[in-house]
Amino acid sequence: MATSVSTIGAANKAPLSLNNSVAGTSVPSTAFFGKTLKKVYGKGVSSPKVTNRSLRIAAEEKDADPKKQTYSDRWKGLVQDFSDDQQDIARGKGMVDSLFQAPTGTGTHHAVLQSYEYVSQGLRQYNMDNTLDGFYIAPSFMDKLVVHITKNFLKLPNIKVPLILGVWGGKGQGKSFQCELVFRKMGINPIMMSAGELESGNAGEPAKLIRQRYREAAEIIRKGNICCLFINDLDAGAGRMGGTTQYTVNNQMVNATLMNIADNPTNVQLPGMYNKQENARVPIIVTGNDFSTLYAPLIRDGRMEKFYWAPTREDRIGVCKGIFRTDNVPEEAVIKIVDTFPGQSIDFFGALRARVYDDEVRKWVSGTGIEAIGDKLLNSFDGPPTFEQPKMTVEKLLEYGNMLVQEQENVKRVQLAETYLKEAALGDANADAINTGNF
């Protein structure tokens, strides 16, 4: 019988004894195979009560065949792997190097996925779905925004990625709305700014606000949530529209601040303080109608990547299908409406849909009475009125569309401002109505 002896008391180097008992033969240290301990006491000892200052405790191996006992060892799973997922995908074929084994409960020897689940996940492909809640996102628009935002979070070797993406194009083409759809698609809650915040009565306030919003977005990214800074109509707040606008200190500071952030995106400081810790890089998305009004060094290629948004016929049809998606307008009717007004912006079709409700509102006003409109809308216990969805036919939509086009033409053709400057009276203000017989 092999026993291992532990000693208590550093001063006594002789074998310890209890009631004049002699210690057994010591056993060299070996791997511990057993799962139980057996205490051995000397002859004449009936209880483990200690009466002397010395004590001997021996551990004894259980009488068992070492080969048979190894297969019943509870730690065997750390070396050998018999789980279904490992065998099915032929990774190790039941034997996995202990280097890749984790502690019990977290190791690869616990089956998590079957082989068909591994295959299904491996075959899963990324789908560039360009719809969100029934709204259409132009593929080229989504591609530009997604690639730009993704590039700014990647560390590409020896590549300088522009921090700012400038989306510009004609009025009412849905630039801001398309950006918001892409943000929602990517799960981004952007930090928003508008052109009205780029001017202030105090010099330097807009530039400071840009830095504050940028650092706010950087803090969101530091916490693990993707974010970006979105500035609407940058050219309206920081651009120069000929002689109609005055170039102020704040215009200059806004352009200079954006240039500085684009050059040092991870070192954006607030005025009056300096923090050595770098902030996260935040991609900036700006929209506008004409970037030629901006400061030229700001829009150079190294700082701003420019994207001209001009929706194609397919894009216009896709967006209009989203506008009329709840009105049961057939696709053929939407295509006909888009082709009838090819030169109109996308915003035109939203205004066209709103015009259809004019008849319903007019009926409610005539039934309620003009004097009681305020009470019915604001002070009624029943709340504001609700309308049944009017039926939208192609004929009605085309009729209202032609009315909107005529109003646009009147604004461009009549130009009363020039007449007012020339004469004190109306002059030819009513000439258009007289010629058309509507005077």
Swiss-Prot record:
Changing R211S: In clone PTA1.1. Keywords: ATP-binding, Chloroplast, Nucleotide-binding, Plastid, Transit peptide. Gene3D superfamilies: 1.10.8.1070, P-loop containing nucleotide triphosphate hydrolases (3.40.50.300). The keyword Ribosomal protein does not apply. ATP binds at G169, G170, K171, G172, Q173, G174, K175, S176. GO terms for cellular component: chloroplast stroma. It holds the Pfam family RuBisCO_activase_AAA_helical. Transmembrane segments: none annotated. GO terms for molecular function: ATP binding; ATP hydrolysis activity; ribulose-1,5-bisphosphate carboxylase/oxygenase activator activity. Its main location: plastid. It is found in: Plastid, Chloroplast stroma. Belongs to the RuBisCO activase family. This is Ribulose bisphosphate carboxylase/oxygenase activase 2, chloroplastic. It comes from Nicotiana tabacum.
